[in-house]
Amino acid sequence: MKAAQFFLYSLLFFASAALSSANIAEFDEYWQKKSKVAQAKAKKAYTPHPEEVTNHFNKAVHSSFEGNSTRRNLRTNKLGQCLATNPIDRCWRCKKNWSANRKDLVKCVKGFGRKTTGGAAGEIYVVTDPSDDSLTDPKFGTLRWGVIQDRPLWIIFGKSMVIRLKQELIINNDKTIDGRGANVQIAGGAQLTVQFVHNVIIHGIHIHDIKPGEGGLIRDSEKHSGIRTRSDGDGISIIGSSNIWIDHVSLARCSDGLIDVILGSTAITISNCHLTEHDDVMLLGASDTYTQDEIMQVTVAFNHFGRGLVQRMPRCRYGFVHVVNNDYTHWIMYAVGGSQHPTIISQGNRYIAPHIEAAKEVTKRDYAEPAEWSKWTWKSQGDLFVSGAFFVESGGPFENKYSKKDLIKAKPGTFVQRLTRFSGALNCKENMEC
């Protein structure tokens, strides 16, 4: 009996170790230290009162539709005026000098990732070379050289380019990848990996047709290279990281997920993205046994879940997920799902059900009987349901948990098409409103 218990414990231990060192073949002293620092940063980034963050976000959305300035920003585009239809975009898009003040973007983030500053404390680094020839000694001018630096950098692109990554691109702390002003495509190669780091912004790029990388020796900082196992082929993989903002990114056709957020990642905002042509779209929490995902807090806002999508928009485990003012125009199986009692607050989204009669339900609970999942807090507030779509709620009244400081609701689902109309990477020109 004791031998059997020991064997089972050993299996669980090694499974947990393998999970916590995702894609790292040799979990050496460098990665062990980096993992501990990342965990400490994540705990610090976690907010014990997530309702206050949702209230702050809702107030910003509400304010963006008030006053004369709003009417100017929502006017028709017949004369070429700038249209900025949600509070994140209103913060920067209609300023002609955005390219001279790129770092002002950090003032615009909302939701759980609102404290993210990326590389704002560092220099601007210009990518001029789309090649990815060396994984251990990347050339100056390449994207890989920029993201592995140990200091903050605001990374921009000197021209439009297609970058085919030979292996996963491992992004270091305090980085912004800012594609505004160029057509930047990460395509046909390996994924972007944000692992055991903090303070990263990815903005204004296209990511598509991503394949698994075979692994091998890859540099992940100025001072360290390590052996990596096979990467999954996600578009963006966020592993054990905090203070992350993904904004105005277009994603399609990746081998695994478009965006995965796993292993205790938290303080994350995914906003203004356009997601298309994919099955498993967005995974928030990868394992039912990884209870550390309890600290996961993610805002999913102003995104367009578009043509060719099947499921997981997102699929959640544990944690707290605020799904607000997104446009769900396509799914085949379901839109929002989960297991292991995540809290999911759906506010002001538009859900357009497919013509498949069995797929009208927005929600899907996995691996739990109704007696169990009926206790999970899944709430729909102000959502718009089209073509027979419906959201199965559960849990007690979430309103009782709200902070009394701000009880302003998100804009209802009828506003969503306007709020998300400029999702995905934008065609920004320098010295012009974007």
From Swiss-Prot:
Signal peptide: 1-22
Pathway connected to this protein: Glycan metabolism; pectin degradation; 2-dehydro-3-deoxy-D-gluconate from pectin: step 2/5
Any one of the GO BP annotations: pectin catabolic process
Molecular function terms from GO: metal ion binding; pectate lyase activity
Alphabetical UniProt keywords: Calcium, Glycoprotein, Lyase, Metal-binding, Signal
Cofactor note: Binds 1 Ca(2+) ion. Required for its activity.
Binding site for Ca(2+): D232, D256, D260
Cofactor(s) this protein cannot do without: Ca(2+)
Source superkingdom: Eukaryota
Keyword DNA-binding in record: no
One Pfam entry name: Pec_lyase_N
EC number: 4.2.2.2
Top EC category: lyase
Family: Belongs to the polysaccharide lyase 1 family.
Protein name: Pectate lyase
Natural source organism: Lilium longiflorum (Trumpet lily)
